[in-house]
């Protein structure tokens, strides 16, 4: 079994829980997810099966879309609704224009510091392990891309009795929406936290493409595997090059290829090689030999 499943991860499960259950449902060990979703977050989680596990990093690299609820006037230890309260502040009225000005400032390339309760590693340990032990450590900042921030709940002002607003966030990989909520609050002069989150898109997969674990189980029991997307779906945004039978045979053996073959795509960081409409391998420019391309991953198995 090879392909990609757009799973709808339900609230209360870890991404690893989903992989564990899918291994049982699909009767295969080769299952991998494409980027962790926190347990209290529901949403699109593409799952790679079989040879598609080789593509997990490329699927993870694609952009994401989230719908978040952000609450002003209270910050928490975890930057979301599960944490303990750190600070509170009564809200004076915040107009839609003031909120929009803050959103505009945070659109584009921004710098974030990951929350202490996160899986980012510092000195070989995950930040949440330090946090649970009550140890504060210096966290590495990271640059992330925020493509758009759109308020979804109208233009009413935010007040003490109405401190929550709904936001659609289109962003690049590695963005912490919890931290973005805190950053919006800081620009408005208030403590803030993310009170709810849903991922509505991950790469090329949207909410309406997804199946739940129960739906996948039901289909498997009926011997129906039409929910599997082909491997090619995972590299939709990657440059592609059609190859002939002679080159195909070389690629299966991981042979270096001349740069001249890649003239139409030579400036791309990586290229998907396609033979008879199927993904065979991913090649990239050789780091030392400028006239050659080398295999990054050979996807298709050589026939015995």
Curated annotation (Swiss-Prot):
UniProt EC number: 5.4.99.25
GO molecular function: RNA binding; tRNA pseudouridine(55) synthase activity
First-level EC class: isomerase
Domain of life: Bacteria
Record-annotated active site: 38 (nucleophile)
Single GO biological process annotation from the record: mRNA pseudouridine synthesis
Pfam family of the protein (one): TruB_C_2
Span of the signal peptide: none
Reactions mediated catalytically: uridine(55) in tRNA = pseudouridine(55) in tRNA
Keywords, comma-separated and alphabetical: Isomerase, tRNA processing
HAMAP family per record: TruB_bact (MF_01080)
NCBIfam families named in the record: TruB (TIGR00431)
Task performed by this protein: Responsible for synthesis of pseudouridine from uracil-55 in the psi GC loop of transfer RNAs.
UniProt record similarity statement: Belongs to the pseudouridine synthase TruB family. Type 1 subfamily.
Protein name, as recorded: tRNA pseudouridine synthase B
Gene from which this protein is expressed: truB
